[in-house]
Amino acid sequence: MKRSRLVPQHIFSIISKRYLAKHAYQKTLNLPKTKFPNRSNLEITLRELIPKSSQLVYKEQLRDFFEEFSKLNTTDEKLEFIKEKLFILHDGPPYANGELHLGHALNKILKDIINRYQLSQGKYIFYKPGWDCHGLPIEIKALKDLSAQQIESISPLKIRSMALKHAQKAIKRQRETFQHFAILTDWETPYLTMDKDYEINQLNIFKEMYERGLIKRQNKPVYWGTETRTALAEGELEYNENHKSIAAYVKFPLEKKSQMDLCKKLGITNNLPIYCLIWTSTPWTLLSNRAICFNQDFSYSLLRLNSELILVETGSIDKLGLTTNSFETIKQFQGTHLNGLYYQNLLVDDKVGRPLLHGAHVTSGTGTGLVHTAPGHGQDDYLIGIQNGLEIYSPVDHQGRYQLNELPQSVRSIVRDEGDLTKGRQVLDAETAKIILCKLSDLNLLYKSHEYTHSYPYDWRSKKPVIIRATPQWFADLHDVKNLALESISRVKFCPKRGYSRLSSFMKSRNEWCISRQRSWGIPILSFYKKSEPDSVLMNSEILAHAIEKIKQKGINAWFNDKDNDMKEWLPEKYHDVAHEYCRSQDTMDVWFDSGSSWSVIKDFYEKSLKLSKLPSPLYQVCLEGSDQHRGWFQSSLLTKVASSNVPVAPYEEVITHGFTLDENGLKMSKSVGNTISPEAIIRGDENLGLPALGVDGLRYLIAQSNFTTDIVAGPTVMKHVGEALKKVRLTFRYLLSNLQKSQDFNLLPIEQLRRVDQYTLYKINELLETTREHYQKYNFSKVLITLQYHLNNELSAFYFDISKDILYSNQISSLARRQVQTTLVHILNAYRAILAPILPVMVQEVWKYIPEGWLQGQEHIDINPMRGKWPFLDSNTEIVTSFENFELKILKQFQEEFKRLSLEEGVTKTTHSHVTIFTKHHLPFSSDELCDILQSSAVDILQMDDNNNSLPTIELGSGINVQILVERSKRHNCPRCWKANSAEEDKLCDRCKEAVDHLMS
């Protein structure tokens, strides 16, 4: 016969007291029970929980959006619906190269938290992840196994094919890792900057900018990467504050006629040679010198040094290291006297007089007030050159070597590469500077040289110093565009607010954007060069439109096919007679132009998917990227948008920036330092790094708990704290689930039918919901978790959970008090679901897997889908809450003080062994049983206060009501079931427990 689950009452009399105490009634208690595991299972997380909480939810809600949208008729209705119900956070595309690092996880998870919060607020989410697919790093990686000779001979089409495969592989790997982060999106339909539609959109943006007169080709100085062999934009530079150069003070002699003219202007007689003393930190550019600039507002001095005269700005004399007796000031004069003078550059010995020119850029901070000017190697120099008709001369090739055939014969021998006599020396080689300075010294033109530590631009890809070199490049004119851009961002919100200053300062300093690159893996600039005159370029709106249409038909690779020499196909019919004279340009666009055109993805969504003829403005609500993107993607998307539309409206409504990831020593994580931590190491754990396995939610918790607007720290110590915090949350969910399994009635009671302590607890839950919602709206995710942890520790663990256990475990399963507690627990569970779903979607999804279905069926307050459930609001009776704070909580506080006394005096260690008597002359708004539950005593009596209780502490409860409290050891026996000292006889059940057991037996 099968043994009965319950032990008959008469059997207890023959069982030992010890066994009775520990085991006899255990099966009659409603002990917590759930299959919700103590730890997450990564295999189940990846296979089941992430798809269910992420991709499936995203697709479902987007289908619902389209269904609702399809019911609307007018454009105004549709735009209003989009404004009210659609939330778009546009994904700045990560680069399709290499493995993902913690910074990628930081970026994607922050975006996901925002999207999931918006989903909880009843919004529909459109979030399309993207990848930035073109550019030099991918091209270099694709060609890394080839020799330099092979690379020189390989065709652009082959390079593109190899780069494409590399990008595709990188995207596949990165996508697989991104999917482990539980991101709310559809990974099957990302946007790629190498997609055909994307490329056509980008070419059309270029065409619109060209039609507005913003695109121009000029031979002017640009930053040039000698390692990567391409022009660079300002955004592709990083500055080394400790770069060391060899700087020099160099003398340039005035021509004889200019010497005479100056002496005449100054009213002096002189037979000594006069030299202009310049200072430079780039001696290699002296071969390209075309002028010396001065500032006509400065005071200059003519100094006698031994048997020669030196011209310098008066305030610079102290920098020359001269002793008082070593020089004589012949004359001080205004800079205007230098107008019209000429000097010679004896280093190149070309007998050509070079002018002294006024330049407002000349300052007295460094140097001598006389500035060596090489229009082919500097921005200010270039402007002076254009204004004065100087040659834009740059005898340096794409490898950063002197071009010997471009140099005068007199200097070719000294800058010839000794290892290869057909080539010039590398201009940045320290030995090159020494050779030039040695030559200057031989010519008696070197005053002195010294090592100079200063800030210098480096190529952010190769980490090598760049040069400034004049080459024919395509530029976007930003003089007017930046004013539109600045006007537009004055209406953009920034988080943190300092982002506005950073972005606007970068914008103000830009007058142009070099958009051409000399690489094969990119979007082509659709221009044509005359074969016989490479500087003669053919481009207009008609040609651009024709070429774009041809690319639509043949694909973009056709442009790079060097076997396709039929130019008639690429040019409109009216150019067919001369088409054979032209060839297609091989220049490609800056990759920042690529990613900066990504707002067209959102534009396509409106126009192609939603069939809208009128678009929302701005196009999307939020973009979120690292703080380095103020000079990158935030700027390029802003520029392309306002430049192509000619309207001062940014594509985004709000810009959010995050910091970088640091190790526990505060060092920025980098491969070169060897202190990086991969997201997978955090998810799976890494013994070598001392990292515990935190799972997907642990990675997300780590990111959410940080103040992401500054740099975030990650390492073993931080991970340990995250693991402990995550465990607390998980155990809280486990407690809730385990006490919701047993119930005869899964219907929630109305809040007004709950006990006062339950209503107070739900009021605190509502406060928590409101506070955390405010934090979410301000992107203070760390404060969300801090607030929740405080509530968990102080309101739940230390109070409500503690006082509810006796009712949950010992009361009849169908008792009103137990139903009241369970109703409260369901509301707590649902509130924690709402608060944590944006941060810990996997855990929340897992919780819902184990919640009894009865609590989910037909309930107004709780949704069957935890990711799409509403943000709860619990309507509290504030009068009851205030009364509870004034009555029960004040009594509880005094009880705790009195119990400490009882414990010290009589050794009572458990409140369940105490008896409480409340004396009062007033009616109290609670029952003795309710107060007993809160105090967790064995029993509470409420008696009439008399004058004999003066020795008892009096508690002022407000409104003239006061009570006295007596706490003493209970005179009754411990109940062997609930352990309260409330039984009339030893080893006998208390009345409450006897009724519960009898109910089970019936």
From Swiss-Prot:
Top-level taxon in the UniProt lineage: Eukaryota
- Locations listed in the record: Mitochondrion matrix
For this protein, the record's CDD domains field holds: Anticodon_Ia_Ile_BEm (cd07960), IleRS_core (cd00818)
UniProt keyword Membrane present: no
A Pfam family the protein falls into? tRNA-synt_1
| Binding-site list for ATP | K671
Which keywords accompany this UniProt record?
A: Aminoacyl-tRNA synthetase, ATP-binding, Ligase, Mitochondrion, Nucleotide-binding, Protein biosynthesis
Tell me what reaction this enzyme catalyses. Answer: tRNA(Ile) + L-isoleucine + ATP = L-isoleucyl-tRNA(Ile) + AMP + diphosphate
* Keyword Transmembrane helix belongs to the record: no
Q: Which family does it belong to?
A: Belongs to the class-I aminoacyl-tRNA synthetase family.
Name of the molecule in the record: Isoleucine--tRNA ligase, mitochondrial
Please report the organism this UniProt entry assigns to the protein.
Saccharomyces cerevisiae (strain ATCC 204508 / S288c) (Baker's yeast)
Q: What is the lineage of its organism?
A: Eukaryota, Fungi, Dikarya, Ascomycota, Saccharomycotina
